[in-house]
């Protein structure tokens, strides 16, 4: 086996032959897949670019965050949440669960391993994964667990660099409304994050203006004390999807009235059908709707342009703001490092639609790209572990026990 260092100033390149799959990402997706593989007797190696597990949850989320779904819909495979956890665990409780999950399954990711590129080598039948520290990892299997929310997404809005007021940040940098106290804040994006950040701003005596560019479904988080999501999942077992959607919209109308009057136009497609077709989730209200009705959260149309002091809007209005927060979601970063192949789109999502997007070719797998949250992650992890577990067992039966963990250090002669 030969090695050709990319960095000629560093004369040594490490090549590591991995005993089992390489998993990229130590978030919930990577942890769940590693645990499921372990339960099938398959070892794995997780490479994580940050210095901890679940770095997105740990450092890129706001303080008041709680799971929007009940905990039994958010558990990872093979380990329940502690019984004493509340129905909707907090961010810190979820992080503690993930830490205990990693400890329980003895998952030890290699941290601060930023993958520069990964490509399949047809001559050897191995995936070659190169990290920033001049190390190359080789395996027959590559599992992409970086997910659909790897990097912050900013929409293309003219003038963003012109703004000279206060802060202009992505929601991933937002922690609490305390730093925006008494400010007039523009919140761009009306998903769950945008709604909840606006709620938090009001509670810290700020004045949020929430941009709603497109149609959006807003549902109550609970119906008569029962999770709306849970009600929907139960009804789908015996009723057609469109009937379930009609029921959910009836409950929403009873809770909020006609949201069009508030500037929140509903899509023509029902919430569950829209989720299945586009992956766009409905907003589950945790208190923002009452503040919108009272006028404490003001709804604005789409932003046409960011100005030096604020923004111009599609309806012709122009307003000044002290700060701007982009609650515009995240994007996959797969295209920046995965080389070759046509399994992913240019946006970094599997071309094969749910529920079959977890399997690529030549030992490539993906987990966390279903647009179905932690439920989708758990489903992917179980399927991947099942398929690789079968391949692993067949290899053992075929006397391939000599594929053991090996470490080689090559020194360039150039």
Swiss-Prot record:
UniProt: FAD binding residues: 25-30
Organism whose genome encodes this protein: Arabidopsis thaliana (Mouse-ear cress)
Matches recorded under Pfam families: FMO-like
Cofactor: FAD
Record protein name field: Probable indole-3-pyruvate monooxygenase YUCCA1
Result for mutant: residue 30 to D: In yuc1-5; loss of activity
Reactions catalysed according to its record: indole-3-pyruvate + NADPH + O2 + H(+) = (indol-3-yl)acetate + CO2 + NADP(+) + H2O
Gene Ontology annotations of biological process type: auxin biosynthetic process
Tissue: Expressed in the apical meristems and young floral primordia. Detected in the floral meristems and at the base of the floral organs.
């Amino acid at each position: 086996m030969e090695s050709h260092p990319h960095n000629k100033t560093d004369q040594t390149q490490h090549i590591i032959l991995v005993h089992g799959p390489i998993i990229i990402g130590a978030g919930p997706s990577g942890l769940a897949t590693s645990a499921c593989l372990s339960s099938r007797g398959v070892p794995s190696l997780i490479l994580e670019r940050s210095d901890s597990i679940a770095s997105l949850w740990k450092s890129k989320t706001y303080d008041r965050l709680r799971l929007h779904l009940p905990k039994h819909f958010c558990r990872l495979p093979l380990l329940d949440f502690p019984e004493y956890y509340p129905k909707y665990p907090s961010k810190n409780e979820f992080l503690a669960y993930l830490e205990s999950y990693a400890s329980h399954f003895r998952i030890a990711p290699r941290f601060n391993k930023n993958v520069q590129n990964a490509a399949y080598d047809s001559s050897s039948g191995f995936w070659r994964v190169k990290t920033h520290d001049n190390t190359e990892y080789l395996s027959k299997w590559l599992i992409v667990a970086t997910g659909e929310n790897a990097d912050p997404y900013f929409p293309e809005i003219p003038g963003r660099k012109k703004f000279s007021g206060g802060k202009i940040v992505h929601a991933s940098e937002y922690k609490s409304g305390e730093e925006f106290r008494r400010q007039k804040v523009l919140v761009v994006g009306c998903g769950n994050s945008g709604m909840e950040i606006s709620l938090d701003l009001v509670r810290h005596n700020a004045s949020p203006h929430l941009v709603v560019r497109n149609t959006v479904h807003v549902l109550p988080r609970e119906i008569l004390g029962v999770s709306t999501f849970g009600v929907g999942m139960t009804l789908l077992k015996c009723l057609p999807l469109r009937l379930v959607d009609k029921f959910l919209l009836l409950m929403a109308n009873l809770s909020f009235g006609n949201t069009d009057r508030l500037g929140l136009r509903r899509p023509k497609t029902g919430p569950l059908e829209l989720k299945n077709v586009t992956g766009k989730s409905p907003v589950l209200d945790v208190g923002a709707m009452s503040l919108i009705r009272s006028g404490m959260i003001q709804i604005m149309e789409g932003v046409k342009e960011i100005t030096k002091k604020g923004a111009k809007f599609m309806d012709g209005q122009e307003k000044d703001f002290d700060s701007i927060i982009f609650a515009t979601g995240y994007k996959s970063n797969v295209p920046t490092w995965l080389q070759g192949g046509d399994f992913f789109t240019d946006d970094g999502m599997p071309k094969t639609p749910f529920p079959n997007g977890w399997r690529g070719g030549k030992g490539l797998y993906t987990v966390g790209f279903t647009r179905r949250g932690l439920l989708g992650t758990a489903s992917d992890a179980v399927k991947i572990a099942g398929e690789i577990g079968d391949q692993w067992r067949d290899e053992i039966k075929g006397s391939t026990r000599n594929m053991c963990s090996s470490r080689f250090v090559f020194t360039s002669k150039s």
